[in-house]
Swiss-Prot record:
GO terms for biological process: lipid catabolic process. GO terms for cellular component: membrane. It comes from the Viruses. Its EC number is 3.1.1.-. It comes from Invertebrate iridescent virus 6. Its main location: membrane. The chain crosses the membrane at residues 26-46, 53-73. PANTHER family: ANNEXIN, PNPLA DOMAIN-CONTAINING PROTEIN. This is Probable lipid hydrolase 463L. It is a multi-pass membrane protein. Probable lipid hydrolase. Residues 27-207 form the PNPLA domain. The active site is at S60, D194. PROSITE patterns: PNPLA.
């Protein structure tokens, strides 16, 4: 019996999806700004048991979603909160006309994004200053966030083990810094930009962490991105790992989402993600019933 559905990434490399795992222990989400709504739809369509996930790994907008999932939100609840909160992106008009991109960086402000995030934290009785260590002690979940350190030209990884006293909000601000839109941000005498610039789909981090912790063979990883998001061609080397399921949601060709996407665009993305995930599951079930 063939337990797998075989699919293709944007480079034509095959990857697979299996119905074997009853639940997942590790979740990986790519970056992609508002394209993260596709990922929320996919997670909802897969009917993943979020409460069974012990490790959340995210880049850029994926890191924000991972954090919200780790404190108890469902993919659908996060999606609904985005429909209720439209003004995520604020234009820095003074900087737009002057060309000054210092301080907060870029031509736009991320202030409203993090105001919205803080609101969601308060609703779950999570302190805005919660650190990685406090988060782990409170939730029992491991959160791994990545950002690109342009001062040292390397990827920095933030976890309760490497940066226990770092406030999670600070790590998310470092990770979700899309170049030009937001610009670099300074932290501990280093400047950071969006983690997706270096590694937008960190499957490798999940597998290395899995091996480092001597995880069981029954501990599966689920990794979700959009088909045409930014990921390197050599990512296919990680597809062969036996305990990973990958979902790449087909981006809608006529939709170019931004941080000011309309509710209709958000709904379209969520539905596309949900449809893709549901289709993969149906194909797998159909194949195994023949």
């Amino acid at each position: 019996m063939n337990h797998f559905v075989y699919l293709m990434d944007k480079y034509g490399n095959p990857y697979s999806f299996s119905l074997k795992p009853k639940y997942y222990k590790t979740l990986v989400l790519s970056g992609g700004a508002m394209r993260g709504v596709y990922l929320l739809g996919a997670l909802n369509g897969l009917k993943i048991k979020i409460n069974k996930i012990s490790t959340f790994i995210g880049i850029s907008s994926g890191s924000i979603i991972c954090f919200l999932l780790s404190i108890g939100y469902t993919p659908y609840e996060i999606f609904i909160s985005l429909l209720k909160y439209d003004n995520l992106l604020t234009i820095n008009l003074d900087k737009l006309y002057s060309g000054d991109t210092r301080n907060e960086g870029g031509l736009f402000s991320s202030e409203n994004i993090f105001k919205h995030l803080e609101t969601q934290m308060r609703l779950k009785e999570i302190s805005r200053s919660i650190t990685f260590k406090e988060h782990f002690e409170k939730t029992g979940k491991i959160l791994i966030v990545m950002a690109f350190n342009i001062t040292k030209c390397k990827e920095d990884i933030f976890t309760y083990e490497t940066t226990p006293d770092m406030e999670i909000l600070n790590s998310l601000k470092l990770s979700a810094r899309i170049p030009i839109i937001f610009g670099p941000i300074k932290y501990n005498n280093n400047f950071y930009i969006d983690g997706g610039v270096w590694n937008n789909f960190p499957i490798d981090i999940a597998i290395k962490y899995h091996n480092k912790k001597n995880k069981k063979k029954s501990d599966w990883i689920i990794a979700v991105t959009t088909l045409f998001s930014t990921y390197k061609q050599n990512i296919h080397q990680w597809y062969k790992f036996s305990n990973i399921n990958i979902v790449m949601v087909n981006d809608t060709p006529d939709l170019n989402p931004s941080l000011v996407s309309s509710d209709l665009e958000k709904l379209t993305m969520f539905n596309k993600g949900e449809e893709k995930a549901s289709l993969i599951k149906k194909q797998n079930i159909r194949r195994n019933s023949i």
